[in-house]
């Protein structure tokens, strides 16, 4: 028994390098715990050359149990009730290792009764019942109905969508053009109304505009006679040319401001109001009278001076300047305008 125990301990402690517990001896040698403790103590006494650590468990009177690794320092030795070697450890730190062991044959208490395991009742297997396989009914195959493919419909839809998109774009463009034309027409109407109001308020200006228009028309007729030479024009062409020229002259006159139009009036019309003003001034100087007041002050009475002519309102200037910006005449109109102005100044110089 001692040889078996020592062989088992050496094998596990030095070859496998695992700790040996006293419970390992109980399971391996099938002995009781007191016998296992005795064998552990005998092995500790006999083997003095080998190096290993001994783990001891001490039971004290105050019902405390301590695991001691250092045998040289055992505390409270007088109060120890029981002490035994718990394990041999080949390493410094104690890590218990437990093997899986079948403990059916290692019972500490034995009796005359034997354990019997009842045999498991056999499971009666159910016989397989054969199911009748239903034969599929064979029916005559009917010809499938042919239907048109959906791809054509999809293609036509995509084409329709494309046509709709172009139509929508065209409609939107037309609406925008209509709005723009209506806006331009409204602006033209407003300009014409403003010009008519200005002409009604200032009849002198309207007369001046007519005179200027007649002068430009006469100059244009003279230039046409010089350029035309021996080529007589038909009455229809002359009428149409006169209308176009009149329209061009009116557009040019509309582009000029009120001050510019007044600058183009002949000198005779400008000298007349200046003479009248000079004639009025001495009268106004002769009219004031003076008399001596009760307090001895000289009091002079003068008539109220005539109000100076009003300048054209800024609204009119803005309307005329906006008409200048919006109406951009072509190169032909500019040439005509330059020609008429040159002829006008030549006549004026003569």
Curated annotation (Swiss-Prot):
> Which keywords does the record carry?
DNA replication, DNA-directed DNA polymerase, Nucleotidyltransferase, Nucleus, Phosphoprotein, Transferase
Gene coding for it: POL32
Record field: compositional bias (Basic and acidic residues)? 146-162, 172-195, 234-248, 274-286
The keyword Nucleotidyltransferase is assigned to this record: yes
Which residues does this entry mark as bearing Phosphothreonine?
223
Phosphoserine (modified residue): where?
230
This chain belongs to which protein, by name? DNA polymerase delta subunit 3
**Subunit structure comment from the entry:** DNA polymerase delta is a heterotrimer of POL3, POL32 and HYS2. POL32 can form homodimers.
Q: Which ranges are annotated Polar residues under compositional bias? A: 320-332
Q: Where in the cell is it found?
A: Nucleus
Q: What else is known?
A: Present with 2410 molecules/cell in log phase SD medium.
**UniProt entry tagged with the keyword Hydrolase:** no
Q: Output the Gene Ontology terms for molecular function.
A: DNA-directed DNA polymerase activity; H3-H4 histone complex chaperone activity
């Amino acid at each position: 028994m001692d040889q078996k125990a020592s062989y088992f301990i050496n094998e596990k402690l030095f070859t496998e390098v695992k700790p040996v517990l006293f419970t390992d001896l109980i399971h391996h040698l099938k002995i009781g715990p007191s016998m296992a403790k005795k064998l552990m103590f005998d092995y500790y006494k006999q083997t003095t050359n080998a190096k290993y650590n001994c783990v001891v468990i001490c039971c004290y009177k105050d019902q405390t149990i301590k695991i001691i690794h250092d045998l040289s320092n055992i505390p409270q030795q007088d109060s120890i009730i029981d002490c035994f070697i718990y394990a041999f450890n080949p390493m410094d730190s104690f890590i218990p290792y437990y093997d899986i062991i079948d403990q059916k044959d290692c019972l500490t208490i034995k009796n005359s009764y034997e354990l019997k395991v009842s045999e498991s009742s056999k499971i009666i297997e159910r016989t397989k019942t054969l199911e009748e396989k239903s034969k599929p009914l064979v029916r005559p195959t009917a010809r499938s109905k042919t239907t048109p493919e959906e791809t054509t419909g999809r293609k036509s839809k995509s084409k329709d969508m494309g046509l709709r998109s172009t139509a929508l774009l065209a409609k939107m463009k037309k609406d925008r053009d209509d709005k723009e034309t209506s806006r331009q027409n409204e602006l033209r109407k407003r300009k014409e109304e403003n010009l008519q109001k200005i002409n009604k308020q200032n009849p002198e200006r309207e007369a001046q505009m007519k005179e200027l228009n007649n002068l430009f028309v006469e100059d244009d007729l003279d230039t046409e006679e010089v350029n035309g030479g021996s080529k007589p024009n038909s009455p229809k062409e002359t009428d149409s040319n006169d209308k176009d020229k009149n329209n061009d002259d009116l557009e040019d006159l509309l582009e000029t401001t009120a001050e510019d139009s007044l600058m183009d009036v002949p000198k005779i019309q400008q000298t007349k109001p200046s003479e009248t003003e000079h004639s009025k001034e001495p009268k106004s100087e002769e009219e004031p009278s003076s008399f001596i007041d009760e307090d001895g002050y000289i009091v002079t009475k003068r008539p109220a001076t005539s109000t100076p002519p009003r300048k054209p309102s800024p609204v009119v200037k803005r309307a005329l300047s906006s008409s200048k910006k919006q109406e951009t005449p072509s190169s032909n109109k500019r040439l005509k305008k330059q020609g008429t102005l040159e002829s006008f100044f030549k006549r004026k110089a003569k």
